[in-house]
Amino acid sequence: MIRQLNSPGGGGGLGLNNPRAQQPPGAQQQQQPQQAQQQFYDDEPYQANASQFRFGAGKSMEQRRETGNLIPIAQRSMGSTSTPFGSAPTQSYFGGGSSGAALSSPRKMQQTHQMLFGNIQPPRGSPPSDGSDKIHRFGESPTPGGVGGVFGTELDDLIIDELMGMEDDQRMRPGATRPMTIGGEKTMSMARPIPGASSRAGSGHSGSPITIPNAMSNNFRQVVSSSAPTSSIDIEKMIGAVSNGGGNSGGDNDPEDYYRDRRKKDIHNMIERRRRYNINDRIKELGQMLPKNTSEDMKLNKGTILKASCDYIRVLQKDREQAMKTQQQQKSLESTAHKYADRVKELEEMLARQGVQVPPSHLPPIPKVIERPIKQEIDESPPNHTPTGSFVSSSGFLSEVTNNTAAMQITSPNDSRPNNFMNNSAPSDSFFSVGSASPPDYRTSSGTASWKLPGSNAFSDLMMDDLNPMMNGDPLISSAGAHPSPHFHSSQMSPDIHWDASGFSPDPINTQQSNSGHYHMDFS
């Protein structure tokens, strides 16, 4: 015999919906099967409280109601049944029979039910439940001394373990949802149901289709960040959180936690962007500090700027090392020079104590870059003394300075000071003066030939007379005429002036002597 336990469309519990249950008590006394029933409470969908009941002989329907402490259950406002497996109406059948199975469930639960309950077929013509007297909640169970009590306890433990295992699997895979068909047309999700206290739409269960759009819109408002691009939103994760929890605020897929993680990523990206801008600014500043010849030839990007900076720093390091070496050498030379100077003073003091005349100390001669004769200044001497020149003497530093100064005074074409090149002669500003009453005195002009130095024949083309533009025109002009009066200062540098030798040699003897003194010079 088959007893049918049906959860009608208006309630969530299990009740009696078998036509044979409405028979008189006399007919029911002949039917004494043992059955076990599992009751699921609406306010605690994750826990199952199974109660066992036994239809004994000689008991009426009213007695069984009193024994089972039956409590009527109100119908759902939405008109749909919510079970631990979903929100669609589900039928459960307990008992022993030989007909085919009509129950559809997940693969794991289907295998468990087939192993425990066998194949159960509900009757086709069973009328639906229409009264609250046939919808009962079994809160108390009789003593589990019989066979039915032991079987119900084991069934309770197995079903609770299966439900908790499915819940853990669903938590591990938040985005994987599988549709489960019931009756071939209706679908429902494998997501675990959420208590009605956390529902935002006021429904008894958050798995209701009415609450899903609101939850999705709220999650969209919470998840999307103003600084994050649209592609960075994990849509699959968000939909999985909505399908699993809807309005759950304390689960693993909490939108607030996701928003917090997204905000942390945004702050991290902002810090990295600021650091990158700082590095780019420093590289640009470094490129501006490079030498122009280094930065003009190459394309200024980050790599070339850093490479050129490294090369330039190496060059600066080498220069610094070289400068330090030079400074150390200079210090060592200075210390050595001080030691030598102290030693020389000691030796001079020793010679002075011995009565030896100490020669005057002279500085070493200045090295000559170009060895060539230098014209000397005419010394003041008696009229009959012919001024002569000499080579630079190495006898002392004072003589060198005197000779160099004399040479500079002689060869300077811009010297406007009045110089007397010959003794007892007119001043230099009276030479070639316009309107002069008497010609200049050439009594010592014969000595001009003796100004030529002894070794000047071999270096006639290197004489400093070539530096004077007035001497390039005529070899008969003496060196005394190289410095005319300041009246001709502006005209002596003019290239249009051509000097004539006949106008400057009134005395034939002096002219002959001058010619004899300059016969070896070639001014071509």
Curated annotation (Swiss-Prot):
Keywords: Coiled coil, Cytoplasm, DNA-binding, Nucleus, Transcription, Transcription regulation. Induction: Up-regulated by fasting. InterPro entries: bHLH_dom, HLH_DNA-bd_sf. Disruption phenotype: RNAi-mediated knockdown in adults reduces lifespan on eat-2, daf-2 and rsks-1 mutant backgrounds. RNAi-mediated knockdown during the fourth larval stage reduces lifespan on a clk-1 mutant background. RNAi-mediated knockdown reduces the expression of mml-1 on a glp-1 mutant background. RNAi-mediated knockdown increases expression of lmp-1 and sqst-1. Its main location: nucleus. One of its GO terms (biological process) is regulation of transcription by RNA polymerase II. It comes from the Eukaryota. The keyword Iron does not apply. GO terms for cellular component: cytoplasm; nucleus. Residues 77-93 have a biased composition (Polar residues). Residues 263-316 form the bHLH domain. Residues 277-316 are annotated as: Helix-loop-helix motif. Expressed in the intestine and at lower levels in other tissues, including the spermatheca and the vulva. Expressed in cholinergic motor neurons. The keyword Nucleus applies. Residues 16-39, 196-208 have a biased composition (Low complexity). GO terms for molecular function: DNA-binding transcription factor activity, RNA polymerase II-specific; protein dimerization activity; RNA polymerase II cis-regulatory region sequence-specific DNA binding. Residues 1-150, 170-214, 240-265 are annotated as: Disordered. Residues 263-276 are annotated as: Basic motif. It is found in: Nucleus; Cytoplasm. Residues 316-350 form a coiled coil. Belongs to the MiT/TFE family. Homodimer. Transcription factor which regulates the expression of genes involved in lipid metabolism and autophagy in response to nutrient availability, bacterial pore-forming toxins or heat shock. Binds to the E-box motif 5'-CACGTG-3'. Under fasting conditions, binds to the promoter and activates the expression of lipase genes lipl-2, lipl-3 and lipl-5, and to a lesser extent, lipl-1, thereby regulating lipolysis. Involved in modulating longevity in response to TOR signaling, dietary restriction, germline signaling, heat shock and the insulin-like signaling pathway. This is Helix-loop-helix protein 30. It comes from Caenorhabditis elegans. The lineage of its organism: Eukaryota, Metazoa, Ecdysozoa, Nematoda, Chromadorea.
